[in-house]
Amino acid sequence: MKRRDTANLKDAVMASKTIDHAFTAQSLTSAASDPTFAGALSFMRRRFSKDLTDVDTVVWGIPFDAAASNRPGARFGPQAIRRASAIFDNDPQYPFSRDLFAEMAVIDYGDCLLDYGNHQDTPGSIEAQARTILDADAFLLTLGGDHFITWPLLKAHAALHGPLALVQFDAHQDTWFDDNRRIDHGSFVARAVRDGIIDPARSIQVGIRTHAPDDFGIRLVHGYELEEMTAAEVSRLILDHVGGHPAYLTFDIDCLDPAFAPGTGTPVAGGPSSAKILSVLHRLGGLDVRGADVVEVAPAYDHADVTAIAAATVAMYMLGLRAERLSAR
């Protein structure tokens, strides 16, 4: 090829590219071409938008950590996860067989508006704003924030779908009693059971490595059991237990061993690797997931962004499960 032709080809390639895809995207299903080190940091470079028209899936941040019992900092989780997600936005999303955004319209809805000085109003604010998204018939993937946020999210989803099967990846059961006034990330499951918004008999918690006062009849997979099982066995257990019941998928990053997720508020040794958990998630395509979240990323305690990268990858897998379910309709 002549030097002039090569130069023209390079010019044509560059002309086809854009930067700041989160603002310049012409289509909700268009591919991004931002380099990983530059551009506006929406989740996987999806368009920043509050317009829910023709949207399949909404990614939303809730920067709240006032319920943390140990190390705070999860309010910075949504930003960290978005930043980490830039590493794989330009490529076909492994291990899925299709470009997740070729047919699934995904937007980054930004963050939940909260009054940082009035925590008692936080659950109602989260629930109301989540309902706005869900009422537009969009699937909601939320980035936390501490695990308290899952309670109002469950309320919003259950208002549409009825009691849900909770599929929870976590080192903690989060079943501590409260009086409905406490702001505590360790009690959201107890509240959800009490409120009748989850079905304990269909719910399952994976990776548990701490004690709690009550399991409410929820199926537990302890950390030592998870270590002894294959990923295929774990996923089959989840699918068999939940069945075809509508489910909510919540992933506390402290489910992972601190070697793979040090950047979190309440790390617990003895957990699984990111590789094993991703293998489990990839096999959960049979779940009827109605909503999902990734929580408890506290980047101040992270090293080389390993926690944020793990969380962004978990979130990407959740989008992959959603895309596969849409394509199967």
Predicted regions, residues:
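Conserved alpha-helical scaffold segments that buttress catalytic/binding sites
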Residues: 9-329
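Basic polycationic patches enriched in arginine
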Residues: 3-4
